[in-house]
């Protein structure tokens, strides 16, 4: 059974009653966590651990001695935690809480719980919660341990430093975008390093000096970012930084949802993708959007699949931005030929097979008509055709006519570097027939050359490459 997706939420339980059903070690841990946030725990159990007993005697908690009763919920309870080793008692407490529409957490029971208590990293007022939805708590605990080693106490002190000056910062930067950029600048500066060295006075002086400066005039900019091809893990660190600083993200159709989820949550995302068969946004309209938002002082990310300068019209966009005086930068990405080849186990160059690589766009018939097919037919080179699914029959015909041998191996990679990747292999003679037989659909990349034969024993990702089917007795190229 798949657990429901949980909505992440932090609760203010200060001076609010929480019923903990159970008096053992698990209940003790839950109660201790509640006391840390100022809650008013009410413990319902026949007996208590030594620590719970001591807290009850000193008035830190209230003890309802006995087995769970519905009447315990007559008090002003905000949350119920069932933490006994008796399933029937936990069930009774959960049913009663559900009947009164109370949030209830039953320890180690996803089905009975409507809230889960996450693993937490605490650094002063800074709290980072990690949850597996109750399905795999050990994963959450493991990740918490990893974060514990990465996030030291200075981050808690930095959080406190900002919190103490919250009103001053808001008054100095009333515009939310300007305020966000101020925080980003300070977070990238020396504050945290000074606090790590226990140099609190210097950190305070640095922040005060920053607040005393006249807020800079905001100017917009555009960053062309390559999202890589397929696997979101191929996104570069610079690309991730740009996504987290963006106000507006203009993204192409092939950019994955996983990559978009890495962006700053409140950044506006606008799809401007192009499709040969579906809705497309004109390049002129993309130019207008970049100009409009940059002139409004916003940081625009033009997010493209693969690399912006490899069949991505990035050059045209930079020329437009330069003409209109808009600041820009370019963050390269891993282009489809590199990503697809790597994930298919195909070295694009190889001392024994290929000394050069040619990247070719096969987007439309006019693109194919301009190619030097005689040069492409030369041996000992690897050809990578982008956007060429519809043009495969033409590619096969023109290469054969130009003298490329029909036995030249190829690999057709559909959804490269993605979980659903499919690799089809064969020879130039069977190229169009193979694509038709396996109903290949975009996005797909054609790699042609002797190196593609290596995919058969070098592949490592996804399913085994599929061999070309037997061609029909007659298969004129059309």
From Swiss-Prot:
Task: Cite the InterPro entries for this sequence.
Answer: 4pyrrol_Mease (IPR000878), 4pyrrol_Methylase_sf (IPR035996), 4pyrrole_Mease_sub1 (IPR014777), 4pyrrole_Mease_sub2 (IPR014776), CobA/CysG_C (IPR006366), NAD(P)-bd_dom_sf (IPR036291), Siro_Cobalamin_biosynth (IPR050161), Sirohaem_synt_dimer_dom_sf (IPR037115)
User: Which residues bind NAD(+) per the record?
Assistant: 25-26, 46-47
State the residue spans of region: Precorrin-2 dehydrogenase /sirohydrochlorin ferrochelatase.
Answer: 1-207
Q: Which residues form the active site?
A: 252, 274
Which residues are recorded as modified (Phosphoserine)? 132
UniProt record, GO biological process: cobalamin biosynthetic process; methylation; siroheme biosynthetic process
What keywords would UniProt list here? Cobalamin biosynthesis, Lyase, Methyltransferase, Multifunctional enzyme, NAD, Oxidoreductase, Phosphoprotein, Porphyrin biosynthesis, S-adenosyl-L-methionine, Transferase
Q: Which domain of life is it from?
A: Bacteria
Catalysed reaction(s)? uroporphyrinogen III + 2 S-adenosyl-L-methionine = precorrin-2 + 2 S-adenosyl-L-homocysteine + H(+); precorrin-2 + NAD(+) = sirohydrochlorin + NADH + 2 H(+); siroheme + 2 H(+) = sirohydrochlorin + Fe(2+)
Q: Which pathway does it operate in?
A: Cofactor biosynthesis; adenosylcobalamin biosynthesis; precorrin-2 from uroporphyrinogen III: step 1/1; Cofactor biosynthesis; adenosylcobalamin biosynthesis; sirohydrochlorin from precorrin-2: step 1/1; Porphyrin-containing compound metabolism; siroheme biosynthesis; precorrin-2 from uroporphyrinogen III: step 1/1; Porphyrin-containing compound metabolism; siroheme biosynthesis; siroheme from sirohydrochlorin: step 1/1
The UniProt entry, under PROSITE patterns, shows: SUMT_2 (PS00840)
MF terms (GO), sorted A to Z: NAD binding; precorrin-2 dehydrogenase activity; sirohydrochlorin ferrochelatase activity; uroporphyrin-III C-methyltransferase activity
Report the HAMAP family cross-referenced here: Siroheme_synth (MF_01646)
Q: Which family does it belong to?
A: In the N-terminal section; belongs to the precorrin-2 dehydrogenase / sirohydrochlorin ferrochelatase family.
Q: Which NCBIfam families match?
A: cobA_cysG_Cterm, cysG_Nterm, PRK06136.1, PRK10637.1
Record-given protein name: Siroheme synthase
This chain's source organism reads Xylella fastidiosa (strain Temecula1 / ATCC 700964)
């Amino acid at each position: 059974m798949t657990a429901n997706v949980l909505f992440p939420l932090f609760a203010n339980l200060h001076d609010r009653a929480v019923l903990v059903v159970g008096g053992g070690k698990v209940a003790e841990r839950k109660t201790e966590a509640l006391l840390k946030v100022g809650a008013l725990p009410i413990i319902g159990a026949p007996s208590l651990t030594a620590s719970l007993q001591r807290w009850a005697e000193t008035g830190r908690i209230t003890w309802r001695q006995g087995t769970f009763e519905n009447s315990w919920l007559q008090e002003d309870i905000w949350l119920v935690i069932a933490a006994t080793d008796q399933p029937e008692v936990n069930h009774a407490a959960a049913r009663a809480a559900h009947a009164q529409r109370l949030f209830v957490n039953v320890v180690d029971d996803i089905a009975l719980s409507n809230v889960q208590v996450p693993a937490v990293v605490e650094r002063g007022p800074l709290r980072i919660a990690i949850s597996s939805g109750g399905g795999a708590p050990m994963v959450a605990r493991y990740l918490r341990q990893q974060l514990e080693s990465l996030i030291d106490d200075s981050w808690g002190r930095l959080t406190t430093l900002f919190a103490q000056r919250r009103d001053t910062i808001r008054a100095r930067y009333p515009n939310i975008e300007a305020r966000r950029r101020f925080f980003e600048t300070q977070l990238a500066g020396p504050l945290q390093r000074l606090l790590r060295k226990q140099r609190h006075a210097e950190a305070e002086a640095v922040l005060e000096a920053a607040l005393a400066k006249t807020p800079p005039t905001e100017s917009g900019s555009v960053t062309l970012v390559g999202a890589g091809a397929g696997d979101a893990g191929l996104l570069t660190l610079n690309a991730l930084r740009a996504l987290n600083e963006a106000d507006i993200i203009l993204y192409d159709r092939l950019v994955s949802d996983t990559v978009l989820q890495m962006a700053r949550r409140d950044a506006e995302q606008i799809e401007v993708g192009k499709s040969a068969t579906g809705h497309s946004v004109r390049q002129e309209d993309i130019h207008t959007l970049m100009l409009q938002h940059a002139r409004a002082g916003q940081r625009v990310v033009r997010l493209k699949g693969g690399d912006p300068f490899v069949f991505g019209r990035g050059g045209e966009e930079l020329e437009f931005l330069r003409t209109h005086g808009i600041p820009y930068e370019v963050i390269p990405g891993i282009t489809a030929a590199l990503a697809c080849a790597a994930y298919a186990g195909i070295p694009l160059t190889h001392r024994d097979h290929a000394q050069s690589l040619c990247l070719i766009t096969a987007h439309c018939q006019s693109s194919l008509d301009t190619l030097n097919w005689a040069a492409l037919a030369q041996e000992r080179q690897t050809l990578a055709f982008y956007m060429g699914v519809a043009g495969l029959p033409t590619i096969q015909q023109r290469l054969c006519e130009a003298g490329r041998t029909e036995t030249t191996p190829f690999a057709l990679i559909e959804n490269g570097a993605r979980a659903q990747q499919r690799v089809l292999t064969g020879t130039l003679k069977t190229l169009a027939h193979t694509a038709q037989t396996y109903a290949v659909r975009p996005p797909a990349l054609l790699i042609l050359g002797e190196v593609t034969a290596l995919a058969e024993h070098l592949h490592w990702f996804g399913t085994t490459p599929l061999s070309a089917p037997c061609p029909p007795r007659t298969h004129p190229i059309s």
